[in-house]
């Protein structure tokens, strides 16, 4: 139930779904809900203004029953994966409508304590914007007997040195470590490590009219083979990655087999993590000759964090050293993450919006075939202008074809999608990040380390004095 005592039932779910797809609200996650692990009948058409709500495959039957009509058949796992997406987080109709503006294009819901109502394992007790949010245990939560904490206090602290000071003073119980802080605590037994569900990669704007060489496959391959991933990862305390599918992505959950464990996954790996300086120089020479250039200068945009500065500066130094400083120069431009997202996605209206940047999509660990949606032609928030008919075809087959459940079919399709991205260097994978946390001794985890799709389960931990 909601914290005010109102029942949370199918009506709330139905209203949530309708608001996700509302054409006027233009929710950025609408496409994730309309067509992701499952494709809902006419959902995307409704969002784009090409169908009525009555045509959408979402039906409210009664207070406890909903029907979802999909374009193709799906198994229960696919449906559960789809409904576990953050786009399905329940919203309260009364509060959502109370915060709506006059033309129904925006709502203030979720922007302050007065504009929000809780229903989960914890309830908002105090909310000070840009400072802290205090939660208390929800006694009416269906699984309240599994919640040991009396509450949670989240502090908003941007400066990493201040975060560490709060931890050392005993004012917070866990903190995520930056690279520099991790180096100081690397041998501390309180450190928790786990692979991150994402591969950081260089994003290439292949349609930039001011830098046509970015459309040259040999040039992109030169950048790919010219990345010394092992040394970079050693510097930034990550794992080198010449692949796109992270090590966390499972092909067979029952057998605990990841894609990278399979023969197909191993076949997409390269020696020395893809670093081949001689091949890179040869490809660079051929590409720059084909484009009629004597020297090339590119700009890389990156988010203004310690890690991304380190990674960008590494490439700024290593690529000119490899290709020749008199022939290649990489300029860097830092900016806030939200501004960077706008710049990257700006290629759709301004093809010259950027040249090189960074990406790192987080996909579903249990459905690696679905995680490739970010590179399909129909994904609405694409970072780069990669549009490939063959890629779309393989993606649709892996996610919707009748034979996708047959032995080995999806495995081959995942391998093929990864190959279509990496072989022509449409994206340039560099590292797979590692979660780095420092945990107070009094905080006892309910898990034996990091668990796929659950993490460290902080909400289910205990305080043991």
Where are these regions (language model features)?
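Ligand-site clamp/hinge motif
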Residues: 110, 140-185
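Ligand/substrate-recognition segments at binding pockets and active sites
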Residues: 129, 273-363, 373, 435
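Long beta-strand-rich cores associated with HINT superfamily self-processing modules
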Residues: 437-465
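Surface-exposed binding/hinge segments that line
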Residues: 14, 28-99
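Structural transition elements
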Residues: 240-286, 304-310, 405
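Extracytoplasmic/peripheral linker and loop segments enriched in polar/acidic and small residues
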Residues: 233-236, 273, 327-342, 368-442, ...
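Aromatic- and charge-enriched surface segment that lines or borders ligand/interaction sites
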Residues: 1-36, 67, 213, 409
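Gly/Pro-rich hinge or "lid" segments in bacterial periplasmic/extracellular proteins
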Residues: 70-74, 81-147, 151
